[in-house]
Amino acid sequence: MYIRLGKFQLQTDPEKTRKFYKKMKYVTDGCGCAGCRNFEKAVDYMPDEVFCFFHSLGIDMKKITEIYVNRANPDGTILYGGFCHLCGTMPEGKSAWVETQETSDSKTFVWQKANTYEISDDFRVSFQEECALVEKGFPRPVLQMEIEAAIPWVLEEENPYL
């Protein structure tokens, strides 16, 4: 299926992606920190456009590959980053992660919002063909979808990131 998402043109296979996600573990099966537990529970409260977007690509948001807290925002939401995988290719577009420096043993990247697709006011994604932590057996070809999202604190416990 060919789709256009802002500057990105993707060829995806949502059914192949969905079939693999059925076998994957939940975020909290791999990490029990407050940030991961909050993200997994907050999925139930995501705006319809965010839920429908992930569903249309075959991705179960509660089973994404990597999620992490960047910081608490002044409005009390948590700025999350992370990524997940989907079956497909990217004939057009470039990642929001832009290299700013390279040394003999490391690279430094910066996130450029101009290279993202906005799903909602608080949720942006970017795509890239260079992938990290691809799950064993994930069908090829594989794309990585990078996430940046401001998500409310929904756990019934104190927010340790404030």
Where are the model-predicted features located?
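Short, charged low-complexity linear segments at domain edges
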Residues: M1-K22
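Intrinsic-disorder-associated interaction segments
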Residues: L10, V43-P47, L79
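A structural detector for beta-sheet-dominated domains
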Residues: Q11, H55, K62, C87-T89, ...
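N-terminal interaction modules that seed assembly of large macromolecular complexes
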Residues: K16-G58
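Ordered hydrophobic segments in well-structured contexts
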Residues: G32, T77-G88, R124, P141-A150
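Short Fe-S-cluster ligation motifs
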Residues: M61-G76
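Short flanking/linker segments adjacent to small metal-binding domains or redox-active Cys/His motifs
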Residues: A72-S120
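Glycine-rich, aromatic-bearing surface loops/beta-hairpins
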Residues: N115-L162
